[in-house]
Amino acid sequence: MKKSLLLLLTALLTVSTLSAQGADVLRRKYSQVSYGKNNFIHGDWKMKSDFAVNFTSGRTFYLHEDEIAGLIRFGIDGTWTDFTYAKYTRPLAVDGKNNDYKFHQVDYALNVGPSVHINPIDDVFVHTYFRYAPAYSLFMGDKQIYGNYATYFVTGLSVSYNFIALGFEGRFGNCDYNNIASAKRIEQFKPNEENVIDERVKHRGWRVYVSFMF
């Protein structure tokens, strides 16, 4: 009986010690899933996405181990995976008939930028960041595929408790798309005009996310 109590006490002390140490460990890696909307702005018209989903994974490189004033840490975020898919629906009248055309956008980006991490109490953190996000963007219609390098910027804010965080971020940028595949010219973008993306496309969007930090 005494041995059992001793083992139980030892186990409780070990768990307590690990928990206390875990609170001081910097959580450097992050993975997040998000849902949002995107605006595709081409010339004088704008198309809003039905939805957009994203998966992001990366790491924070803290510039110092100890908190400044017992409250703030600064870091550099490096995101190795930033994958976004957005779906659009645009009603157009072609040959006197109304049709809903579907469009799909796929982006793969890398991110880098500064971040600020505030620890007001215990395991609660507030994170804010601004990242430069070079990407390759694909935009696909029924018969066309466009693609090119895109320049994005991402800024956001999240609140975490222990290893989980809820956040919101804005995403904006632009892309000069090139037609990289074409099966047939159809009037998807501008009725009665050749189907081309002949101006720089601006992207504006937002997303809410759940993030896991390790």
Describe these PLM feature segments.
Residues 41-48, 84-94, 138-149, 178-187:
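Outer-membrane beta-barrel translocator domains and adjoining extracellular loop/strand segments
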Residues 40, 146-214:
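Predominantly the C-terminal beta-signal and adjacent terminal strand-loop region
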Residues 1-26, 213:
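Cleavable N-terminal export/targeting peptides
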Residues 20-69, 200-214:
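Short glycine/proline- and aromatic-enriched beta-strand/turn motifs that initiate or cap beta-hairpins
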Residues 27, 47-55, 68-70, 104-110, ...:
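Residues that define the transmembrane beta-barrel architecture of outer-membrane proteins
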Residues 62-67, 119-123, 161-164:
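Outer-membrane beta-barrel channels and translocator barrels
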Residues 29-35, 72-76, 112, 128-132, ...:
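Membrane-embedded beta-strand positions of outer-membrane beta-barrel proteins
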Residues 35-41, 76-84, 132-140, 161-163, ...:
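Transmembrane beta-strands of outer-membrane beta-barrel pores
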